[in-house]
């Protein structure tokens, strides 16, 4: 599945276009198509703390997660972390499993625009660390 197909799917799911961010700045070339000045982002924010290859498999897992949720009820600091494993290949290194934590997600208003925001954190699987 291509990234643009995932974007289209999320648009149908949430009623707004996502902007894909990596480390708060990398947009994978998508954001320029979906916002004017950056203030009214309807965004799917993939916030990762360690460099990784954001491939379509990772995005597919995130989108599948979104599709199963009640978005409006999840945007809360009291929401417990949701964790799942995702397989991500890294450039010039071994393939690795990552644990993805959903920090929070849901519909919110930004500058009078209804947006869907999803914040995730990736953590390298501790099973890979030597005892």
Where in this protein do the model-derived segments appear?
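DNA replication sliding-clamp ring fold and its partner-interaction surfaces
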Residues: 1-15, 59
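Detector for the mature cores of small, proteolytically processed
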Residues: 15-131
